[in-house]
Amino acid sequence: MKTLLLTLVVLTIACLDLGYTKTCFNDDLTNPKTTELCRHSMYFCFKNSWIAGGVERIERGCSLTCPDIKYNGKYIYCCTRDNCNA
C-alpha cells in the first residue's frame, strides 16, 4: 500500500507544472498570432517595431530583461502579463 501511494505521489509531481510558465506572442506577420512558452528565466514579453524600406516591421517574443533603449526609430514595448505583446 505504501509503495502504491509513493508511486502515485511521484507521478503526480512529475505530471504537474510546479512553476508558472509565461506565454508571449511570437513571430511577426502570422495571422492568427501564434504564442510560445517562455523559459523559466524569461519574465517579459516584448514587441519591437520599426520602419524599414517604407514597411513596418514587427518582432515579438520572450525576454529576460526589458530593453528600454529606442534607437533609429525603433519602438520597444515590454510587459509582464501573458500574451500582452499583441
UniProtKB/Swiss-Prot annotation:
Organism domain of life: Eukaryota
Keyword Acyltransferase: no
Tissue occurrence: Expressed by the venom gland.
Subcellular location: Secreted
Signal peptide: 1-21
PROSITE patterns per record: SNAKE_TOXIN
GO terms for MF: toxin activity
InterPro entries, per database record: Snake_3FTx (IPR003571), Snake_toxin-like_sf (IPR045860), Snake_toxin_con_site (IPR018354), Toxin_cobra-type (IPR054131)
Name of this chain's protein: Neurotoxin-like protein pMD18-NTL1/2/4/5
Species this protein is from: Bungarus multicinctus
